[in-house]
Amino acid sequence: GYHILISATDANESYLTLAKQRNLDGIIVIGMYPDEFYQQMKKTQIPIVLIDSYCNDHYYNNIRIDDAYGSYLAARYLLDCGHRDAAFFAGQLKENGVMKKRLAGYRQALEEFGVPYRESFVFEGQIDYKSGVAMAASLARSSLGATAVVAAADILAIGAVRGFYDAGLRVPEDMSIIGFDDLEISQYLAPGLTTIRQQISLKGQRAVELLLEHIADPSLSKQEEILPLKL
């Protein structure tokens, strides 16, 4: 069997010290961190698998999706439906982060349809329900004239439905929304939420499998797996 330690690291905590003190055989890291983090973690000399990271250091194994392509599919869906004024709701747009990649996909779709990119149509916040509500309220109060929203996460889309409802706008009659992630909770919305589906559980499964393979044989070459997604 295996012992699993789940830890949220403090901003001031030494990741290298943490790994050594706990005598870890391998590590799975979720999300993006500063470059210093990746340089520090290499010093552990133990197998590490990254999930949802765009770190280009070949020391690491990496499991992710093509976030830009997924967001491109979402934006293109709305454009194919005739929308030319689609806003973009996102979490923090960190350089080389997932949200930045999803913004790039949105921009690519606009460009292909000859629709100008407008920064005023991009709303940035946290990836949570309250941010979705707040973004929708802000868009509803604005004079932008948006008719649709590409939400870079389902939880933002779910919050947005509430925010638009509170502002007197109906979804999808007055405002169309498409999400990203295909969270189970999105199935319970009425009407249902159109979303980009990624297999989140498969990310975890493949990360563990890859980590165990490299613990058993550290000489294995590093791998990057880009998992499928679909509308």
Features from the language model and the residues they span:
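Residue-level signal for nonpolar/aromatic packing positions in well-ordered secondary structure
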Residues: 26-27, 48, 78, 106, ...
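Flexible loop/turn connectors
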Residues: 135-231
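Residue-level detector of anion-binding/catalytic polar loops
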Residues: 3, 47, 84, 116, ...
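Periplasmic-binding protein-like
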Residues: 21-31, 87-90, 122, 141-153, ...
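Hydrophobic packing residues within well-ordered alpha-helices of enzyme cores
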Residues: 37-41, 106, 160, 164
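Alpha-helical recognition/docking segments in bacterial nutrient-uptake
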Residues: 1-76, 140-141, 145
